[in-house]
Amino acid sequence: MIIVLKQHAPADKVQAFCKELNSMGYQINDSVGSDTHILGLIGDTKALAESWVLANPVVETCRRVSEPYKKANRKFHPDDTVVDVGGHKIGGGYFAVMSGPCSVESKEQITYVAQRVQAAGASILRGGAFKPRTSPYSFQGLRAEGLELLQEARKVTGQPIVTELMNNEHIPLFLDAKVDMIQIGARNMQNFELLKAVGKLNVPVLLKRGLSSTLEELVMSAEYIMAEGNPNVVLCERGIRTFETSMRNTLDISAVPMLKKMTHLPVVIDPSHAAGIAFMVPALAQAAVAVGADGLMIETHNDPAKAKSDGAQSLTPDQFDDLMKTIKPELEFFGKTLN
């Protein structure tokens, strides 16, 4: 149930009302917007009479919510959430570009790429230290050493880093490395124990949509994180599996406006994994801006032909420069601030 409070309702009476609701067993998601103050009740409200709620002098109106997600629901939180990643904002009109190699391969590689993408306008450095691969014989990443190299690149550029967490056992390593944003990959989108674990951390989370997951399933995974106390979740559309075989995945561009309607969380697009082919990345990136995304995640490699993973979808630094020159005017046209 959503309860909309009257403007300028006395704080002591609102507090007393909330205390009474708590005593009845309901959790309260308190959302204060620019024009509205909303209490989102979490729990079974079937027995809670609307007439009883409306009788309270601080209540303007109330309505029941049928969706299973509450904390992520835009009805509970009408204003856009803005997630801060190392001083760079995502959402609410702020647009962030995350770029870097699929895999961290060496100090020279990650530092060079970090400097190039930062110069072009990327505010957040992406790079894989632990790599989930389809084949057990493929390069699995430098692991702990990769985290160390990401830290060294951060010292050089000052960029916050985002990298993928694959299991709960690695959390201490990520905390020691002071990872600025934890990525939950598509294959782990419904690893509920992992979601609950990152929900207990004070670190922003980039949650990627699973290859065959519905939008509601994606939002419910975000709900797992938020239910544990971490509100800083960014959703990522990275392509879904369809019958089409000419590209790696199919970018569900319609996911962005629908997710914006369903939830208040920022939504970014990963055109690299969506296409799997480098020449398509700039066009999909432009489409992402036009459809209202809050950011991009793009793979850039100093020498894609020699990349240890996902070279076919990686841009060169020069190609990334050109992409950024293309989307900057587009961002300005749509009133987004590159942050």
Name the predicted role of every residue range.
Residues 1-97:
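Non-catalytic terminal accessory/regulatory regions of metabolic enzymes
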Residues 95-101, 125-127, 161-163, 180-184, ...:
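Hydrophobic faces of well-ordered beta-strands that scaffold small-molecule active sites
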Residues 95-112, 136-140, 160-164, 185-186, ...:
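Active-site mouth loops of central-metabolism enzymes
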Residues 121, 173-182, 197-205, 226-232, ...:
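Glycine-enriched alpha-helix->loop->beta-strand junction motifs that scaffold or abut catalytic
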Residues 126-144, 301-314:
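Glycine-rich, proline-tolerant flexible connector loops at the mouths of alpha/beta enzymes
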Residues 129-133, 187-254:
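Conserved anion-binding
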Residues 132-182, 191-194:
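N-terminal active-site wall of soluble small-molecule enzyme domains
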Residues 139-163, 197-204, 253-267, 313-336:
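Alpha-helix-loop-beta-strand connector modules within alpha/beta enzyme cores
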